[in-house]
């Protein structure tokens, strides 16, 4: 059962759930909290690798990732990031989220943006118990026109679901947590699997 708006506010008030900066009550709706787009992005460099062998030797996977991913792009205030049709890019939420060990979060895109072809997450929409950091967004433009994305715009909504008990291995306490405490548009770390 997902938390309703009153419960989300109570969890925020108690400090069990953290969202910084804290959203105003107008962005806590029914069963979700609206999140905004941050100013950090990463894109794929075109045609710098023939392919990435996802199950190949770790050093080869790492080298291929280095070739295809850009450095982090930090947009100055007021500028737009343009996502062209058929392009995949990484971005990050403006908000940093701290989820307790007995809660799981879910990220959903906004219907208004989806109707224009924008996918906010390709597949990874679960936010694990024990998570702490900003949420990386996997943008894909499946529409026909370039989309101008501006930092600060509403980009998605988080919902939260209590677990049957505290997780025995919450994300941030695991030694193998590849994205622990991320604050930027962190590229894939599949080579760390």
UniProtKB/Swiss-Prot annotation:
It catalyses: dCTP + H2O + H(+) = dUTP + NH4(+). Gene3D superfamilies: 2.70.40.10. GO terms for biological process: dUMP biosynthetic process; dUTP biosynthetic process; nucleobase-containing small molecule interconversion. Pathway: Pyrimidine metabolism; dUMP biosynthesis; dUMP from dCTP (dUTP route): step 1/2. It is an enzyme of class 3 (hydrolase). HAMAP family: dCTP_deaminase (MF_00146). Homotrimer. Catalyzes the deamination of dCTP to dUTP. Belongs to the dCTP deaminase family. This is dCTP deaminase. It comes from Yersinia pestis. The gene is dcd.
């Amino acid at each position: 059962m997902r938390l309703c708006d009153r419960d989300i506010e109570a969890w925020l008030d108690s400090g069990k759930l953290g969202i910084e900066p804290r959203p105003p009550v107008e962005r806590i709706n029914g069963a979700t909290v609206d999140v905004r787009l941050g100013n950090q992005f990463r894109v794929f460099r075109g045609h710098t690798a023939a392919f990435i062998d996802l199950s190949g030797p770790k050093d080869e996977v790492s080298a291929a990732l280095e070739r295809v991913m850009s450095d982090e792009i930090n947009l100055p205030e007021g500028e737009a990031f343009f996502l062209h049709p058929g392009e995949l890019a990484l971005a990050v939420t403006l908000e940093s989220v701290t989820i307790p060990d007995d809660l799981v979060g879910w990220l959903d895109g906004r219907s208004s943006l989806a109707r224009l072809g924008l996918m906010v997450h390709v597949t990874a929409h679960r936010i694990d118990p024990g998570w702490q950091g900003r949420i990386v967004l996997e943008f894909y433009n499946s529409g026909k026109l370039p989309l101008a994305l501006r930092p600060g715009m509403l980009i998605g909504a988080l919902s939260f679901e209590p677990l049957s008990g505290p997780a025995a291995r919450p994300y941030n306490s695991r030694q193998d947590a590849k994205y622990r405490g991320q604050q930027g548009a962190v590229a894939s770390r599949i080579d760390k699997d």
